[in-house]
Amino acid sequence: MHYVAIEESRRDLLKQLQERLEARLEPARAAAIEAFARHFYATVPVEDLVDRRLDDLYGATLSIWQFLQHHDPQSPKVRIFNPDFEEHGWQSTHTFVAVLHEDMPFLVDSVRIELNRRGLTVHAIQNAVFAVARDSQHQLKALTSPKDENAPDARESLIVIEVDRHTDAESLAKIERNLHEVLRDVRTAVSDFDAMCGQITSAIQELEKNCPPQIDPDDHEEAIAFLEWLLKDNFTFLGYDEYLLDGNELQRDPNSVLGVFRLDPVSYTHLTLPTIRLV
């Protein structure tokens, strides 16, 4: 019964939003935005919606819809702003963080973790994946639920997060830069994920061929079992590289680098192993 009441509250609120859209916008635009809102707000906790004035929900919906209109899938889009009634037509006591990105794993958690790392309290998270079609100039042509019949092939993830209000422009710009760096890390790790798993598979196959005489057979089998366990979705591979034994020194093989290790080494000095002298 509680679930039914919650969904009835959601439907009532979205109905009010639909009526407001139809009263203020031309029919085709109102219908497109209403369809977007129905999907975007489908999983948002009702209390996050009912706490807003209808005018603020209307303004937020239009603002997010406008944010979606242009997006190059090869370049993530990040916007951080403080809604102001005079400037945006709606208001909030929070700072809004909006992210539009080609859909892939780890996006929401990575953005949330970065905001938490910066000491920002997250008050609400709204996330939805859309099927989209864009023209050659990256303008939005169609946007639907991925479950819709004949939905476009491309998928984009929209993330909207409300955090503590920050008014310092320099601070907001720094948050935006940091989020771009985090999203770069995500794209790099995800794009190389299959290749990293392939390297682990190759290592397993190599180990299965023979056990070096100086290695205890039980330890050898345990190492193989551990690598196999990692591949069964028990570990998230973010980076990979190899070290070659040259005399009594280990040298990093630059051709083996995958994932986040491919990025600016200055940003990953804490991940880069120094040359190690064996004794």
Predicted regions span which residues?
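Short, surface-exposed ligand-recognition loops at beta-strand->loop->(often short) alpha-helix junctions
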Residues: L100-F106
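Short, well-structured beta-strand/strand-turn elements
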Residues: G119-Q126
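Long, intrinsically disordered, low-complexity Ser/Thr/Pro-rich regulatory/activation regions
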Residues: S145-D148, H166-T167
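Charge-rich interaction surfaces and accessory domains that mediate macromolecular binding and assembly
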Residues: M1-S92, F96-L100, I113-N116, A128, ...
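Beta-rich nucleic-acid/ligand-interaction surfaces
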Residues: A128-P146
